Amino acid sequence: MGSTAILALLLAVLQGVCAEVQLVQSGAEVKKPGESLRISCKGSGYSFTSYWISWVRQMPGKGLEWMGRIDPSDSYTNYSPSFQGHVTISADKSISTAYLQWSSLKASDTAMYYCAR
């Protein structure tokens, strides 16, 4: 097999590996202040316990804010001081899913939330 064919095969394999990694979040929800909420982030295509999962927030018209992260292998968490005590980050490694949870929402929690590996 020529070097060009080997390179093309290697690139095809690498593209396939990268394309399999996914984080799929639960859908949008409409909630009232004072209600609870849990959003999920399901990982696939990689070893879920080998990577931290971070959560970030984007308020309307604003930039991204890092909220915190979890190590799914042992559920160790770090929080931004701005979010400590207001949200809870957890994970269930048996189903490769991380969660972001509020026990009592505020109107100021209106935003887009994203998980990231």
Curated annotation (Swiss-Prot):
Region described as Framework-2: spans on this chain: 53-69
Q: Is Disulfide bond one of the keywords UniProt gives this record? A: yes
- Indicate where this protein is primarily found: secreted
Residues covered by region (Complementarity-determining-1): 45-52
Cysteine disulfide partners in this protein: C41-C115
Q: Which SUPFAM superfamilies match?
A: Immunoglobulin
Tell me the segments the record calls region Complementarity-determining-3.
Answer: 116-117
Region: Complementarity-determining-2, residue numbers:
70-77
Note the superkingdom of the native organism.
Answer: Eukaryota
What are the start and end residues of every segment in region (Framework-3)? Answer: 78-115
Answer whether the UniProt record assigns the keyword Signal to this protein: yes
- Keywords, ordered alphabetically: Adaptive immunity, Cell membrane, Disulfide bond, Immunity, Immunoglobulin, Immunoglobulin domain, Membrane, Secreted, Signal
What are the start and end residues of every segment in region (Framework-1)?
A: 20-44
Q: Name one GO cellular component term.
A: plasma membrane
The entry lists its GO molecular-function terms as:
antigen binding
Residues forming the Ig-like domain are 20-117
Task: Output the GO biological process annotations, alphabetical, semicolon-separated.
Answer: immunoglobulin mediated immune response
| Cited InterPro entries | Ig-like_dom, Ig-like_dom_sf, Ig-like_fold, Ig_V-set, IgHV
Q: State the signal peptide span.
A: 1-19
Gene3D superfamilies given in the database record: Immunoglobulins (2.60.40.10)
Where does the UniProt annotation locate this protein? Secreted; Cell membrane
Function, please? Answer: V region of the variable domain of immunoglobulin heavy chains that participates in the antigen recognition. Immunoglobulins, also known as antibodies, are membrane-bound or secreted glycoproteins produced by B lymphocytes. In the recognition phase of humoral immunity, the membrane-bound immunoglobulins serve as receptors which, upon binding of a specific antigen, trigger the clonal expansion and differentiation of B lymphocytes into immunoglobulins-secreting plasma cells.
User: Subunit details for this protein?
Assistant: Immunoglobulins are composed of two identical heavy chains and two identical light chains; disulfide-linked.
* Record protein name field: Immunoglobulin heavy variable 5-10-1
| Lineage, top ranks | Eukaryota, Metazoa, Chordata, Craniata, Vertebrata
